[in-house]
Curated annotation (Swiss-Prot):
The keyword Acyltransferase does not apply. GO terms for cellular component: 90S preribosome; nucleolus; nucleoplasm; small-subunit processome. The gene is SOF1. It comes from Saccharomyces cerevisiae (strain ATCC 204508 / S288c). It is found in: Nucleus, Nucleolus. PANTHER family: DDB1- AND CUL4-ASSOCIATED FACTOR 13, U3 SMALL NUCLEOLAR RNA U3 SNORNA ASSOCIATED PROTEIN. This is Protein SOF1. GO terms for biological process: maturation of SSU-rRNA; maturation of SSU-rRNA from tricistronic rRNA transcript (SSU-rRNA, 5.8S rRNA, LSU-rRNA). Interacts with snoRNA U3. Interacts with NOP1 and MPP10. Component of the ribosomal small subunit (SSU) processome composed of at least 40 protein subunits and snoRNA U3. Its main location: nucleus.
Length: 489
């Protein structure tokens, strides 16, 4: 006689440690869970509501800010919590983002600080006593570029309560004099070269007082420039003639040029994809380009109602942040044309500078009200230490929100944002104008059969130019073609 019994092993559900939880037996057969999708939808809806409830993006401002507008911000690529800012009164401040206090400040220039960058420590490898130091380059419309030492240990005895103390010559290493006002500055990642904009692009070496060479390709005035952080010999610049020019320092010459309908205010390279870059334009949009094909943009980032003044990439390479003259900050995913987030405050004025922190968790903005503000890149995220259960719950909620993001109620709640009345009214007027233009083009295309359709990603492009060095084989082939043409004639 056989007797069937139920056998259970305590090893399957009794925890080994006191910190572990008892394992619950689960049967994953879908026939036993007919309401699984309904339960998950409810969880996704609750997670979306909680996300909007906990959305508090503003962290605080750095110190007492500046006395004038903030028009230059530079990240320290070798540190997570250090930042440099420059204002219109010529003062530069170096900040500790952890404590939100300044390390040191300099009365650097007698005019507007137009460019700022924190250099790599290898700048002065020839001098052993300067190997471990950090340096900063600043330029201004007073026709000078200055190299500063920002080694934190040298300023550790500075009185933190004296927030108005500004050093003049302390920390200054070298001054470079130019012939005209400078607009924008950036340093090479691997050597002691740096580039400045203005009437021309000048290449400098920190060990020389005069420029090593200059680059130009028909631009009226260079407004901004940026080195590629991966392909370090590639330099991109924007000009006042609505042009974007790419240079190769290995040949010391320009390679490509694109002309747009309106001026570009800022440019930034993708840190993960060395051939892609994004531009901030006067036409209220930001454009994402591939340097291998500049005849069209990869994406167009819309939603701003005024000129986009600055743009920066997240260190992960999948998001960008823009600051606009409409007094707002927007965050975009690189594969989506509309912003996922908008930040604004009542006191914040025109935003001229935005930067991501090096851990992509925070955003720093500078506006012409003199404040340097710190924001969370994800408004609902908190930086506290989380237990394993909290992490698992947050990851589970993110997957649920991703799965049900197209459901009407979840989509409505996740997209809803409170925006200032001025921006909302401007958006309504802009939408009416754009719809009117589209309707007029549709009517015109109905009567004109030869009217071409121009893609949204090509409308801003007036033309592109390539400038390549001809090899001997190319010249020989061209001569043969010319000879064949003359014979045929």
């Amino acid at each position: 006689m056989k007797i069937k019994t139920i056998k259970r092993s305590a090893d399957d559900y009794v925890p080994v440690k006191s910190t572990q939880e008892s394992q619950m037996p689960r049967n994953l057969n879908p026939e036993l869970h007919p309401f699984e999708r309904a339960r998950e939808y409810t969880k996704a809806l609750n997670a979306t509501k909680l996300e909007r409830m906990f959305a508090k993006p503003f962290v605080g401002q750095l110190g007492y800010g500046h006395r004038d507008g903030v028009y230059a911000i530079a990240k320290n690529y070798g540190s997570l919590n250090k930042l440099a800012t420059g204002s219109a009164d010529g003062v530069i401040k170096y900040w500790n983002m952890s404590t939100r206090e300044e390390f040191v400040s300099f009365k650097a220039h007698y005019g507007l600080v137009t460019g700022l960058c924190v250099t790599q420590p290898r700048f002065h490898d020839k001098k052993p006593d300067l190997k471990s130091q950090n340096f900063m380059l600043s330029c201004s419309d007073d026709k000078t570029v200055k190299l500063w030492s920002i080694n934190v240990d040298d300023y550790s005895n500075k009185n933190s309560s004296d927030n108005d103390s500004v050093t003049n010559e302390e920390g200054l290493i070298r001054t470079f004099d130019g012939e005209s006002a400078f607009q924008g500055i950036d340093s090479h990642r691997e050597n002691s070269t740096f580039a400045t904009g203005g009437a021309k692009i000048h290449l400098w070496d920190v060990n020389r007082l005069k420029p090593v060479s200059d680059l130009s390709w028909g631009a009226d005035n260079i407004t901004s420039l940026k080195f590629n952080q991966n392909e370090t010999d590639i330099l991109a610049s924007t000009g006042s003639d609505n042009s974007i020019v790419l240079y190769d320092l290995r040949t010391n010459s320009p390679t490509q040029k694109i002309v747009q309908t309106m001026r570009t205010n800022a440019i930034c390279w993708n840190p993960m994809e060395a051939f892609n870059f994004v531009t901030a334009n006067e036409d209220h949009n930001a454009y994402y380009y591939d340097m291998r094909n500049l005849s069209r943009s990869l994406n167009v980032f819309k939603d701003h109602v005024s000129a986009v003044m600055d743009v920066d990439f997240s260190p992960t390479g999948d998001e960008i942040v823009t600051g606009s003259y409409d007094k707002s900050i927007r965050i975009y995913k690189t594969n989506h044309g509309h912003s996922r987030e908008i930040y604004h405050t009542k006191r914040m004025q025109h935003v001229f500078q935005v930067k991501y922190s090096m851990d992509s968790k925070y955003i720093i903005s500078g506006s012409d009200d003199g404040n340097v503000r710190l924001w969370r890149s994800k408004a609902w995220e908190r930086s506290n230490v989380k237990t394993t259960r909290e992490k698992n719950k947050l990851e589970y909620d993110e997957k649920l929100k991703e799965r049900f993001r197209h459901m009407p109620e979840i989509k409505r709640i996740s997209r809803h944002r409170h925006v200032p009345q001025v921006i909302k009214k401007a958006q309504e007027i802009k939408n009416i104008e754009l719809s009117s233009i589209k309707r007029r083009e549709a009517n015109e295309r109905r009567t004109r059969k030869d009217m071409p359709y121009i893609s949204e990603r090509k409308k801003q492009i007036v033309g592109t130019v390539h400038k390549y060095e001809d090899s001997g084989r190319d010249r020989k082939r061209r001569k043969e073609d010319d000879k064949r043409d003359t014979q045929e004639k």
